[in-house]
Structure formats: C-alpha cells, structure tokens
Amino acid sequence: MVEDQSRYLESNINHNELIKLVPFMSDLPEDSIHKIAAHFVTISHPSNQVLLLENDWGGSVYFILEGWVKIRTYNLDGKEVTLNILGRGEIFGEMAAMDKMPRSTDAITLTKTLIGRIPAEDFVNLIETEPMAGVHLVQLMAKRLRQVNRRLQLREASSISRVADAILFLVEGQGTEGDKGGTEIPNLPHREISSLSGLARETVTRVLTKLEKKGLIQRNADSMRIPDLPALEETIC
C-alpha cells in the first residue's frame, strides 16, 4: 500500500500544537488532543508524490498541515477526473476509515506538503466518543456535498463560468489575504484547473487569459490574486 511506503522522516514538531491548527480538531478537549497526539505522525512529501491509491485499504486518516493535495479518480475512458483539491487544515481518508471499505480515490501532492496522520481506528474512536468530532464530520460531509452539487449544476455553463467557479472553489478552501489586498491562492498548473472544471487545458488557458485581461485575476509564478471576489462571482451564470 502506498501509505505504508513513504521514505520520508517523521517531523519533530510539537504534535499537540500541529493538531490544533487543523479546524477539525481545533476545539476538541485537551484530553482528546493528547490521545490523538500519542499516535500522530507527520511526514513531509515532495510535489507529485502519490499518497494513496484507489482500492487500497484505509489504515490511516490524513490531515494537511502545509501544501496542496489532489483527490482524483478516472472515468470509464481512462481520463483523470479531479474530485477535489485540498489545502492546509483539510482532511482526507476519513471515508475509508468510517465504512471500512477500500479507498475510492487516489490522493497525490501538488506541492511540497506536510501531512499528519493517525490510525483509522483512532479516528473512528474519536468520532464515537467525542460529540464535537462527530459534528465536525457531519459538517465536512455537508460542505463537500454542496461543492459537488455546485459543480454538477455548472456542467452545462459557459467555460468562463466553470473556470471562475474552479478558482472560487480553491479560494473557499485555501484563499488568503494578499499583501496588496484581494485574495490569493497558489497558481496551480492549468492542467489541474482543467481537471477540476472538466474543460480542455487549452480552453482553461484561454479563459484565464481573458480573466486576466479584464483585471479579474492577477498571476505570477507562484500565486494567483483575485482583487475583487464579488466581481469574479458575477461571471458565473
């Protein structure tokens, strides 16, 4: 299994403090945090590292401490389909832990990434014994269902709407305030926005150029800045 084959060393950072940086864990009682920390492992991965493979059995649940992770599958034609792009503070691998079924997707890093993980049985025990953890899990499932519904509703929308929605999707998960105002996200490769929006990469490139010319986005090598989020939202119809 991929999750057991990492060649990267465990970090020595204080695990209690790292766990509190994850929204899912942030307001749990201290005794629950201590129990999680006892089996919490942190591992650094380079970009394009496969973390999990579809049909693997779920031995761990993962928390992103730094970086970006793509959750993907493949359609019947063998084409890659990006289901989600997760960033700092987000969680993955929880479904296989809860239903004790093989994993339904792959997970691969998009950037240098620091991952924390706990054994699946510890996660399940946390959900069963800590009410707030159960509430957080329901909220997480509801959020992801809303995101899927939104993307399905836009399947027949214009290419500009779909690319704008993909950008806003990333902003919702990991947008940060820019040094010059506005909101910033990492400037991911066009192929990732292509897979997320369901459009050809060439189409995504053209749309991004149009959005940049209109002043709705600004790009450099590392980041994309959205000066006015409501203005970008207005392009979705």
PLM features per residue range, with description:
Residues 128-198:
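Polybasic "coupling" helices that flank or enter modular domains
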Residues 1-47, 96-97, 129:
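Cyclic nucleotide-binding regulatory module and flanking cytosolic helices
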